[in-house]
């Protein structure tokens, strides 16, 4: 699923979909690992969360979801993990862009 400008059609759409919904860990060359879906404490050696890469550490704040195992914790000020496992019975998290405040509501 490596990106290159010549990707077209379904191959291009598949790569984009994978980047937006499945990217969690990368190796030193930036290749995505699709196997690990758990907590960072259990990640395979040699892999790095995408939000800790040099490219992601720019001056922009990044809000993301679809990684409930993080339980909203990234350890990075610029990376805000919004998926706190509501569908698994934990909580739903919202982020206020104006104030930077996180609000959580326990799952019903």
Pin down the residues of each PLM region.
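Feature recognizes metal-dependent phosphohydrolase scaffolds
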Residues: 1-108
